[in-house]
């Protein structure tokens, strides 16, 4: 049962790390990155649809994103959705595809994005700590129900802490990497 709690904890923490990776990928650095558009939802035939489901998104050059809709009629809807997003970019529509030129980031904007990355990682750490607390609560309940001894409880809690420390370190590494990426000119 203890091992099941540890395994369950690792699975939940892995999901948190994967969600953090997705969040950090969507924070724009100085280069064009198709993941910047992942959160954009386009009104397509009356229903909100993620942009990556209705168009091929590529970065043919370091500062250009190219969006080629699978259905040409979606071009104006995609352009409208990009303009309404908080990306701060102006799409250019040539009738077949949309190009976005990603402007250089100002020092001030870089610092803002770094703060966003830090907040995102802090939120992930809170989730990890909550998972640690839940695992420890389950272990304490097992000890209270005489399923494990006090020594086993202490050993299991130490293992929970080691797992948590490992994932917190991953969060810190991912954040540090993203901050370097953002601050790179």
UniProtKB/Swiss-Prot annotation:
Main location (coarse class): cytoplasm
TM ranges: none
GO molecular function terms listed in the Swiss-Prot or TrEMBL record: ribosomal large subunit binding
Cellular location(s): Cytoplasm
CDD domains linked: RRF
UniProt key word NAD: no
Superkingdom field: Bacteria
GO process terms (BP): translational termination
Alphabetical list of InterPro entries matching this protein: Ribosome_recyc_fac (IPR002661), Ribosome_recyc_fac_dom (IPR023584), RRF_sf (IPR036191)
Alphabetically ordered keywords of this record: Cytoplasm, Protein biosynthesis
GO CC terms: cytoplasm
Gene3D superfamilies reported for this sequence: 3.30.1360.40, Ribosome-recycling factor
Reported function: Responsible for the release of ribosomes from messenger RNA at the termination of protein biosynthesis. May increase the efficiency of translation by recycling ribosomes from one round of translation to another.
Family: Belongs to the RRF family.
UniProt cross-references to PANTHER family, sorted A to Z: MITOCHONDRIAL RIBOSOME RECYCLING FACTOR PSEUDO 1, RIBOSOME RECYCLING FACTOR
HAMAP family for the chain: RRF
Protein known as: Ribosome-recycling factor
Encoding gene, per UniProt annotation: frr
């Amino acid at each position: 049962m203890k091992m099941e709690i540890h395994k369950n904890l690792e699975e939940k923490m892995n999901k948190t790390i994967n969600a953090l990776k997705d969040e950090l990928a969507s924070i724009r650095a100085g280069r064009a990155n198709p993941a910047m558009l992942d959160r954009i939802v386009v009104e397509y035939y009356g229903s909100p649809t993620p942009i990556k489901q209705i168009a091929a998104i590529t970065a043919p050059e370091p500062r250009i994103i190219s969006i080629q809709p699978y259905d040409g009629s979606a071009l104006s809807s995609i352009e409208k959705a990009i303009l309404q997003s908080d990306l701060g970019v102006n799409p250019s529509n040539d009738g077949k595809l949309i190009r976005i030129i990603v402007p250089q980031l100002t020092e001030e904007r870089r610092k803002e994005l770094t703060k966003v990355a830090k907040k995102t990682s802090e939120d992930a750490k809170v989730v990890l700590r909550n998972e640690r607390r839940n695992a420890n609560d389950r272990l304490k309940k097992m000890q209270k129900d005489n399923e494990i001894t006090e020594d086993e409880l202490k050993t299991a809690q130490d293992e929970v802490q080691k797992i948590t420390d490992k994932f917190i370190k991953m969060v810190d590494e991912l954040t540090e990497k993203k901050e370097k990426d953002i601050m790179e000119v």
